From Swiss-Prot:
GO terms under biological process: lactose catabolic process
Hydrolase as UniProt keyword: yes
Protein name: Beta-galactosidase small subunit
Database matches in SMART domains: Bgal_small_N (SM01038)
Extent of the signal sequence: none
Origin species: Lactobacillus acidophilus (strain ATCC 700396 / NCK56 / N2 / NCFM)
Described function: Component of a beta-galactosidase.
Catalytic reaction equation(s): Hydrolysis of terminal non-reducing beta-D-galactose residues in beta-D-galactosides
InterPro entries: B-gal_small/dom_5, Bact_Beta-galactosidase, Gal_mutarotase_sf_dom, GH-type_carb-bd
Gene Ontology CC annotations of this record: beta-galactosidase complex
C-alpha cells in the first residue's frame, strides 16, 4: 500500500510528530502546544504558540486607567497553564495520551489521513476561565487552527483575544489582502480593501512605545524571511502563508512582543529587532481617542469578557 499522500505519525514519549512531503510538525505535551513548524526545511517557530490577551497600553489606555483595570490579563498573557490535551487520529479518539509506555504499541510506520489535537488552557485570572486551541491537520499538511475563548462572569475587560506566534528571525516583509494601513475596530473608516506589501517589520514611532500595527478584516497573509538560526543556511527568501477560514482574521506583525513594548518608555529602550512576533486576533479592543485624559473607548469597541469568542484560520 502506498502512503504518498498520507501523514506519517510518530508517537514520541512526550511529543507527537507529524511528517509529510516537505513538512514536519512537532506537538509537545510538556510545553502544551505546537513546538516545531518545519516547512521545506525551514523552521517557523521560536516559541510554542500561546493564547494572547494583552496589547501594549496606549496613551488613551493610560489616561482612562484601562491598563489598571485589565492588568490581570498581562499575567495571563505572559504565563500559560495547559490543563488538558485531546488527540484524535483519523477516527480514533485517544482516551489517554499515547506517551510511554503506551506508545510502545506503535511502530515507526504509522500513517493517517488527518489528525486533530486540542490544547486546553486555564487563564491565570480571578476568576479563571478556559481557552481551547484546536489544530486540524489534513493529508496535504494544511493546518486549520481554531481558538475558542470561554467567557465568564466577573472577569476584567480584555485588550485582545488571539494567538501569538514568535518566529526565529525577523521577517523581511509581509504581504496581505485586506484593509489598507493600520486599522482597529474604531479606526477603519478610511481604509480601502486591496492587496498590500509592507517592507520589514515597521513600528509606529510614538514618543512612548505602545500598541501599533494591527490590520483588521484580513483574508490572506504571507510572511517572508530570508535568514534562519542555522549558520549553515544561505540567505534566500522563504514564506509562510495564512488564509481566512470562515471569516477574515485580524493580525499584527512586529519585531516585539506586547511586553517588550510595554516595558519601554522611549523608542531607544527597545531591543534590537531579532524575531518576528505574529498575533492573529479574533477580537480587538478599540484604541479610542476622544481625549487622552479620561475618556473610555466607545462601548461597541470593547471586548466583553463574559461572552464566548471563536475564530479560525488556515496555515500552510
Amino acid at each position: 500500500m502506498a502512503y504518498t499522500n498520507n501523514l506519517q505519525i510518530i508517537y514520541g514519549d512526550a511529543t507527537l510528530g507529524i511528517t509529510g512531503k516537505n513538512f514536519h510538525y512537532l506537538f509537545s505535551y510538556e510545553r502544551g502546544g505546537l513546538e516545531s513548524l518545519n516547512i521545506n526545511n525551514k523552521e517557523w517557530l521560536y516559541r510554542v504558540p500561546t493564547p494572547t490577551f494583552w496589547r501594549a497600553t496606549t496613551d488613551n489606555d493610560r489616561g482612562n486607567g484601562f491598563n489598571l483595570k485589565a492588568s490581570q490579563w498581562l499575567g495571563a498573557d505572559m504565563f500559560t497553564k495547559c490543563t488538558k490535551i485531546e488527540l484524535k487520529v483519523d477516527d480514533r479518539q485517544f482516551d489517554e495520551l499515547p506517551i510511554a509506555p503506551i506508545n510502545n504499541q506503535f511502530s515507526n510506520h504509522e500513517y493517517a489521513d488527518h489528525v486533530q489535537i486540542a490544547f486546553w488552557y486555564q487563564t491565570l485570572t480571578n476568576p479563571a476561565t478556559d481557552v481551547k486551541i484546536i489544530y486540524n491537520i489534513d493529508n496535504t499538511g494544511c493546518i486549520n487552527i481554531v481558538m475558542h475563548y470561554f467567557g465568564k462572569k466577573g472577569l476584567p475587560p480584555l485588550p485582545v483575544i488571539g494567538m501569538r506566534f514568535i518566529m526565529p528571525t525577523a521577517a523581511t516583509g509581509f504581504d496581505y489582502e485586506g484593509l489598507s494601513g493600520e486599522t482597529y475596530p474604531d479606526r477603519m473608516a478610511g481604509a480601502k480593501e486591496g492587496k498590500f506589501h509592507v517592507d520589514g517589520l515597521p513600528v509606529t514611532k510614538y514618543l512612548v512605545p505602545q500598541e501599533n500595527g494591527m490590520h483588521m478584516q484580513t483574508k490572506a497573509l504571507k510572511i517572508t524571511r530570508s535568514s534562519t538560526l542555522n549558520n549553515a543556511d544561505q540567505e534566500s527568501e522563504f514564506s509562510l502563508k495564512l488564509k481566512q477560514d470562515k471569516q477574515p482574521f485580524n493580525f499584527s506583525c512586529l519585531p516585539y512582543t506586547a511586553e517588550e513594548l510595554e516595558n519601554a518608555t522611549h523608542l531607544e529602550e527597545l531591543p534590537l529587532a531579532r524575531r518576528t512576533v505574529l498575533v492573529i486576533a479574533g477580537a480587538v479592543r478599540g484604541v479610542g481617542g476622544i481625549d487622552s485624559w479620561g475618556a473610555d473607548v466607545e462601548k461597541q469597541y470593547h471586548i466583553n469578557p463574559e461572552k464566548d469568542y471563536e475564530f479560525s484560520f488556515n496555515l500552510n
